[in-house]
Amino acid sequence: MNYQLHELFKAVGIHRQIVGKDLIIDSISCDSRHISKGGLFFGLPGEKVDGGIFWRKALASGAVAAVIGEEAAQKDPPSNEDMVFVVSDPVAHWMGEMASVFWKRPSSQIDLIGVTGTNGKTTTTYLIEHLCKQSGITSALFGTLYNRWPKHSEVAIHTTAFGDVLQSQLAQAVAAGARLGVMEISSHALDQRRVAGCSFSGAVFTNLTQDHLDYHESMEAYFQSKALLFQAPLLRDKESCSVVNIDDPWGLRLSKQLNKSCWRASLEKRVIDSIQPELFLTDLNITNKGIEGVLHSPFGQGPFVSSLIGRFNLMNMLEAVGILIQHGVSLQELLPSIKSFSGVPGRMEQIKVEGDLPVVLVDYAHTPDGLKNALIALRSFGSGRLFCVFGCGGDRDRSKRPLMGAIASKFADHVTLTSDNPRTEDPQQILNDVLPGIATETELIIEIDRANAIQMAIMKALPGDIVLIAGKGHENYQILGLETIEFDDREIAKKILHLKLNP
């Protein structure tokens, strides 16, 4: 892929005098370490370092030109002879827009659905991908676990990639024949303009609960970042569709700001603040084997059966079905496909070992709301005791730590407090931050070593008991200081279950 530099600038509305209008670029990157000869470098301001200060390194490595922000230009001013272009912030906006033009605006060539929210993004996107496959729609998935499209699958590095990579991925998916794409979009990605240049045909709001306040500083700022997905320029046009969870107070507020193309979703048929949901469920029967009921939409209703565990997963299912109906898929075609969806790795994933053993599940729940939903869901799973093994991540929102402790002690019969990804924080201090939330009468074990903590909980549990290992889910690593080690809750739990069965 090649593009004339002056034409690229012109296409996004940047008017600059460029000496040598025949300059050609063949790639776009925001990583000065990996910029290739003939590439266009974007220096993005970061939380710790402004990437714009590396423009000299990028040019020395063969970049045709560099695009940087005003602060970087003040720190290391380029001369008139340097092929450096200073743009207004956010620089990431211009990178996304130019990368989109460079790759021939790939998101405009498919139906692209964005899914945002604190919890439920991964399950909702996986459901959409599954339902597309069952309906014969060639799709692409971009998210926390994997990025995949026909004949391609790769482990994701970020929930949402930066614009230089994201637009390339979209172009590859389009070239591979994808007709519909579904993308997890984090609040960081929206705030940092990683999805600039994307054109979404639809958007889904799952919920908004406390998380990332170390980054956003307030729930209002967190909400405003999420809301960016539901307005121009990200939503394609006024007729672009959306599905919003109005059981969530932030979702209810968002729905009032949107047009008639927004479908409001609720788990019950009820009027909420004068709003009647377009999507809702009735006749629910929730058991430890799954859920069944009747799904209602503006295009009819019908029965469904799902193997997903927990009431909270119903909203993920309802919104996935709703957004696909809005994209022209028949409700009657979608309903039978719900039953065959087996779930997402690390999301209420049961560790299966044959024998007279406790039930052990691994879940990614790492927020107060996520942990509460998981524990409440497991109460219907059996009549035995409920064990909870959890910790809190280091270098992240500290205010949620005592809240997590309070929820664990309220909804579990036994709590094992341990490390999550401590990162550069003192693991003991993280546990100390959690402890004020845990009631004094709680049956509690404190064990910093996560593997030992998992073993202690499983060994203490009896057949008929349930052990929830929360926080890390699908992750196959643990971050200790600046080191990342191999660590998988699922593998450790399986090993301990075998040990318990054959001591």
From Swiss-Prot:
ATP binds at G117, T118, N119, G120, K121, T122, T123. It is found in: Cytoplasm. Its cofactor is Mg(2+). Pathway: Cell wall biogenesis; peptidoglycan biosynthesis. It catalyses: UDP-N-acetyl-alpha-D-muramoyl-L-alanyl-D-glutamate + meso-2,6-diaminopimelate + ATP = UDP-N-acetyl-alpha-D-muramoyl-L-alanyl-gamma-D-glutamyl-meso-2,6-diaminopimelate + ADP + phosphate + H(+). GO terms for molecular function: ATP binding; magnesium ion binding; UDP-N-acetylmuramoylalanyl-D-glutamate-2,6-diaminopimelate ligase activity. Carboxylation is probably crucial for Mg(2+) binding and, consequently, for the gamma-phosphate positioning of ATP. The keyword Cell division applies. The modification N6-carboxylysine is found at K226. One of its GO terms (biological process) is cell division. It is an enzyme of class 6 (ligase). It comes from the Bacteria. Meso-2,6-diaminopimelate binds at R396, D420, N421, P422, R423, G471, E475. A motif (Meso-diaminopimelate recognition motif) lies at residues 420-423. Its EC number is 6.3.2.13. Coiled coil: none annotated. UDP-N-acetyl-alpha-D-muramoyl-L-alanyl-D-glutamate binds at S32, T159, T160, S186, Q192, R194. Keywords: ATP-binding, Cell cycle, Cell division, Cell shape, Cell wall biogenesis/degradation, Cytoplasm, Ligase, Magnesium, Nucleotide-binding, Peptidoglycan synthesis. Pfam families: Mur_ligase (PF01225), Mur_ligase_C (PF02875), Mur_ligase_M (PF08245). Catalyzes the addition of meso-diaminopimelic acid to the nucleotide precursor UDP-N-acetylmuramoyl-L-alanyl-D-glutamate (UMAG) in the biosynthesis of bacterial cell-wall peptidoglycan. PANTHER family: MUR LIGASE FAMILY MEMBER (PTHR23135), UDP-N-ACETYLMURAMOYL-L-ALANYL-D-GLUTAMATE--2,6-DIAMINOPIMELATE LIGASE MURE HOMOLOG, CHLOROPLASTIC (PTHR23135:SF4). This is UDP-N-acetylmuramoyl-L-alanyl-D-glutamate--2,6-diaminopimelate ligase. The gene is murE.
